[in-house]
Amino acid sequence: MKIIFTISFTCLLYANLSFAQTQPAWQLLGQLQTRSAKEIKASTWSIGGETLDRDYTDYHAYKKYLGPLGAKRIRLQGGWAKCEKEKGKYNFAWLDSIVNDALSQSVSPWIELSYGNPIYVGGGDAKLAGGIPTSAEALQAWDNWVRATVTHFKDRVVEWEIWNEPDISKTITGDNYADFYIRTAEIVRSVYPKSRLLAFGLAGVQRLEFVEPLFKKLQQQNKLHLVDVFTYHGYSPNPDNSYPAIEKLRQLVWKYKPDVVFMQGENGAPSTPKAITIGAMRDYDWSELTQAKWDLRRMMGDHGRGIATNLFTISDIHYAEGDHMVGVNSKGLLKTNPDKTIERPKMAYAAAQHVFSLFDNTVELQSKIKPQVNSDKISAFVYHKKGKSLLTVWNHEARPAEEFTPQPVQIKVEGSFQQPVYVDLITGKVYSIPTKNYKKTGTTYQFINIPVPDYPVVIADKSILQFK
């Protein structure tokens, strides 16, 4: 039934959305077979399930789309203010139902510990860009809630992120976030010694001065073991323009602790014009096509650099009065109705399915192999699976466009392609590459006049793909 659902959805999607992109004039071999999370043993992919703590999305409206999407993890926000509406009394029932359902679909939740709780004086704000708890009473209450939350979920949740985008708050500094992080991380680790601790959820990847105080204090206190993963966001209209700043961020963190894993903790593009959407990148016009292109470039740009990705987000988000912004953030893979129920999947949902199904942990990045291309506007990364090769390639010159004519590109790469095929990651279509478009010299393959669009496509050996 899962396969029937997926195929029917794909046909419906492309019947209703025009795809303004020239497809190769090559033999069509079939369609990538997508896999549910239950059918994927392991991968680095996560999907955003944010704002359930403030009821801006409805998990139970979108949960039937979660497993078939294929992501192996989902980011949730713990919601101190939603759990503790009366001092000292916790209600985890709302979060229990979500965690249990996600696990039943083989999707592992990771929980961000946030936000503040206004029932306490100095308790911080229960919203994006708000303050952390500061009074003695509120900090003790925070400690108690963190301890209770981790105790309650420790048999089901391994990963714990501490706060979200502290650097956009007007009241949080790098120094006081550092102190807050350390006290919280120590509680998590004391309750659950095998926990995996995620730091920051940093909004601005260029904010090195905000980041360094934490690592200085951790080093001084001999507590660098309290950071396992560094999460960052950093929205850019051209996703490929982010990486120089991300590399500087990595070098800063690795100076203190070289084994910190980097994860894109939240990123995705809107799907509507600027007059409609809110949130990051709202100053540009977007469509469901350019959203799909942008999301693919972020995912494969991260993956090619060994960075895990949490794609933001599964459902459009309905921000309410009193928060950092008001309106619909259209970065969801699922288009919502005004009551937060799901109207339908967007083009980006299918694109993400194709990535999550294909790039699991059996596909190994070959970071030492550098493809040679005849243009500096092209990104390309090489992978191996079962002794065969796979190549991702796209034009990164500009922000994803509504219309873009694929450019003929020459690629030379070391690999093993017994029968090379071309895969469009938006449509999922698999094409045979004509023999005139490639040649082999030893273990070097030269691909000739390969049509490369402004979003990632794949050249792979046919044997490592599952398609119908």
Annotate the PLM regions.
Residues 269-353, 366-376:
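Aromatic/acidic polysaccharide-binding cleft in carbohydrate-active enzymes
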Residues 411-430:
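Solvent-exposed beta-hairpin/edge-strand motifs
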Residues 1-21:
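Bacterial Sec-dependent N-terminal signal peptides
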Residues 371-416, 456-458:
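Carbohydrate-binding surface patches
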Residues 174-301, 305-309:
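Noncatalytic carbohydrate-binding groove/subsite architecture in carbohydrate-active enzymes
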Residues 69-228, 237:
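Substrate-binding cleft and catalytic face of glycoside hydrolase catalytic domains
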Residues 434-468:
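C-terminal beta-strand-rich structural cap/linker in extracellular carbohydrate-active enzymes
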Residues 21-73, 85, 100, 104-106, ...:
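N-terminal carbohydrate-binding accessory modules
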